Design a protein with these regions (language model features):
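Bacterial lipoprotein signal-peptidase II cleavage site
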Residues: 22-29
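Short loop/turn segments immediately following the C-termini of beta-strands
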Residues: 102-104, 153-155, 164, 200-202, ...
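Short loop/turn segments that connect beta-strands within beta-propeller blades
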Residues: 118-123, 163-167, 210-215, 272-275, ...
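Structural signal for beta-propeller blades
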Residues: 107, 115, 157-159, 204-206, ...
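Blade-loop segments of beta-propeller domains
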Residues: 108-146
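Surface-exposed loop and turn segments in beta-propeller and other repeat-based domains
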Residues: 50-75, 123-136, 164-177, 218-234, ...
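C-terminal motif of bacterial Sec signal peptides marking the signal peptidase cleavage site
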Residues: 17-20
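Beta-rich, blade/repeat-based domains predominating
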Residues: 72-94, 131-149, 154, 174-196, ...
């Protein structure tokens, strides 16, 4: 049995044993810390992506409106996060775009309760996938490999799981306080863990829980200390823009998690993210540029980039070549492209307005020539596509 499969089997055995003794089916965090063999991870290619100095943002000259994100049922507005459907299953079709509405029909931020779906072609019309007060202030809609949606509600203070047909499954609360993003992490390998990460704008933490069969199904705040600004509405800042690099080469996976810190104007990389399991395993020190890692041999954080031209970034996109694009929410609607090693590659303003309008980013493609970048625009309540 390969090393990774053996570790997965060990955790599965631990889950069964814990369930038999305690009835909750979860591995206690102290048990994992005391026995490193219980950690479920993926075989890593390397901690950080190979550096690529090719700017994709410079190639994206054309801005195309894909379609409105105004919910057809209740008129919710203010498109926030954006995710792509990767398989056709249930009501969702491969290639479709799912968008969270943060505002209601009157434009009041924090009152939106909808997740809408639209096709990735110009002229698309949105359809309501989920609508519930459970996700009030919807600002995150991570999509799992099984088309489960994990919608984050900033105002409702929880993350809610919905199945492939938009039916309610489960609510995730404490230690989640004020979720401002949710992201899925999966390498697509047999026995590999699939996890959901949630950024919290109240305490600056990152909470993790398993979306699949392997790992801990209970929420654990694995990272603490990111900056928060105690803002309101569109001005809330904290750890956000969560993106996972699950690029595979054979049986090896990159396994790097990226987080934008809008308070400290940084982008942070978490190596071997699948190994994050215990409470406070990584602590972000004041200023957001240095870190304390309890188990460095398993996982740790590094600073990718800090300072100008980053200016209160909220959204983050991971490009196919490993570069990152962040969207500023102060000083204009500027996109900033940075390599995985922290080299500034390009900037691009998509709106001359001084008011922030871009809160969601998503890149798709397989190479430098066919990469496109979707962004949500709260000015016209639509999804745009930047293409060559």
């Amino acid at each position: 049995m390969p090393f990774f499969h053996n570790r997965a089997a060990l955790l599965a055995g631990a889950l069964l044993a814990t369930s038999a003794c305690g009835g909750n089916g979860a591995v206690p965090s102290n048990a994992v810390a005391g026995n490193p063999s219980l950690r479920v991870g993926v075989p890593q290619e390397r901690a950080i992506s190979p550096d690529d100095n090719t700017s994709i943002l410079k190639k994206l000259k054309k801005d195309v409106v894909i379609g409105s994100t105004v919910d057809p049922t209740n008129g919710d507005t203010g498109p926030r996060s954006i995710a792509r459907v990767t398989i056709s299953y249930g009501k969702l079709k491969k290639g479709q775009l799912a968008v969270c509405d943060f505002a209601d029909a009157s434009g009041t931020p924090g009152n939106g309760t909808s997740v809408d779906v639209l096709d990735p072609t110009p002229g698309s019309k949105p359809t309501t996938f989920v609508q519930s007060s459970k996700i009030q202030g919807c600002d995150g809609n991570a999509l799992s490999s099984a088309n489960n949606t994990y919608a984050a509600g900033l105002t409702s203070h929880v993350v809610v799981k919905y199945d492939q047909n938009g039916k309610y499954v489960k609510t995730y609360g404490t230690p989640i306080n004020a979720p401002m993003t949710s992201g899925d992490a999966f390498c697509g390998q047999p026995y590999a863990p699939e996890d959901i990460y949630v950024g919290d704008s109240k305490d600056g933490g990152i909470t993790k829980f398993a979306a699949g069969l392997y790992g801990n199904p209970r929420p654990v705040e694995v990272i603490t200390g990111f900056g928060v600004n105690n803002g309101s509405g569109w001005g809330v800042l904290g750890p956000s823009g969560i993106r996972y690099n699950g690029t595979r080469h054979g049986s090896l996976c990159n396994d790097t998690l990226y987080i934008a810190d809008g308070v400290d104007n940084t982008i942070v990389a978490i190596s071997k993210a699948s190994n994050l399991l215990t409470t406070g395993e990584i602590q972000v020190k004041p200023g957001g540029k240095t870190f304390k890692c309890k188990q460095k041999r398993f996982t740790c954080a590094t600073l990718v980039y800090s300072g100008s031209p980053l200016n209160a970034p909220v959204a983050l996109a991971l490009l196919p070549n490993g570069n990152l694009v962040a969207a500023n929410t102060q000083g204009g609607n500027r996109l900033v492209e940075i390599s995985a090693s922290g080299k500034l590659l390009a900037t691009k303003s998509v709106d001359k307005s001084s008011i922030a309008h871009v809160f969601g980013l998503l890149a798709i493609g397989s190479n430098d020539g066919n990469t496109v970048l979707f962004y949500t625009d709260t000015k016209d309540n639509s999804v745009h596509e930047l293409e060559p």
